[in-house]
């Protein structure tokens, strides 16, 4: 086994251990580097070596779960469908928001990282559809920015879902209200 394969095995162990520990806790961000390393059977320094920080490991753990979720059959059917990109975005964001609403403790755990520390150069799942929607009428940078705004706004609304219910009367746990809100947001940003 070569060095890269061993490193990938270590990364996978760290991600799996992080996910299991986060599921056990009321506050997923309270998971410590030492707990993660102990469960993974590696030294705590491997977290920084592999991921740069505990926060990035937590984010990567969330990303793995999120990407697995996006590979589900329903999502693949939407992506392959022959509907306009804006409609694909509405459907995908509704599915993703549903996942985020169902897992509020994970959403809250990664929101700070997503909003303040995530590499903005990384492509979001929304970008290709935003770009196709504008068909060259906006630059690549403008389309990336719109995709980023869609992503960050989704994180914020889910993070503050109780405030949305209290202050605006929008119950994001109600699928119809969630869909209406997402459609409205996408219509505003992709006018």
What kind of region is each of these model predictions?
Residues 13, 21-56, 60:
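Helix-turn-helix
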Residues 60, 74-106, 140, 146-147:
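Hydrophobic alpha-helical connector segments
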């Amino acid at each position: 086994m070569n060095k890269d394969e061993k490193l990938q095995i270590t990364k996978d162990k760290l991600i799996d251990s992080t996910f299991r520990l986060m599921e056990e806790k009321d506050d997923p961000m309270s998971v410590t580097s030492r707990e993660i390393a102990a469960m993974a059977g590696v030294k705590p320094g491997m977290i920084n070596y592999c991921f740069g920080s505990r926060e990035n490991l937590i984010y990567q753990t969330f990303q793995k779960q999120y990407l697995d979720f996006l590979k589900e059959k329903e999502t693949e059917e939407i992506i392959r469908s022959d509907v306009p990109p804006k409609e694909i975005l509405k459907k995908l964001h509704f599915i993703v928001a549903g996942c985020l609403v169902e897992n509020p403790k994970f959403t809250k755990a990664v929101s700070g990282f997503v909003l303040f520390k995530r590499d903005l150069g990384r492509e979001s799942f929304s970008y290709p559809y935003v770009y196709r929607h504008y068909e060259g009428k906006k630059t690549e940078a403008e389309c990336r920015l719109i995709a980023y705004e869609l992503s960050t706004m989704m994180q914020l609304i889910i993070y503050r879902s109780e405030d949305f219910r209290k202050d605006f009367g929008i119950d994001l746990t109600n699928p119809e209200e969630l869909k209406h809100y997402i459609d409205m947001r996408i219509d505003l940003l992709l006018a």
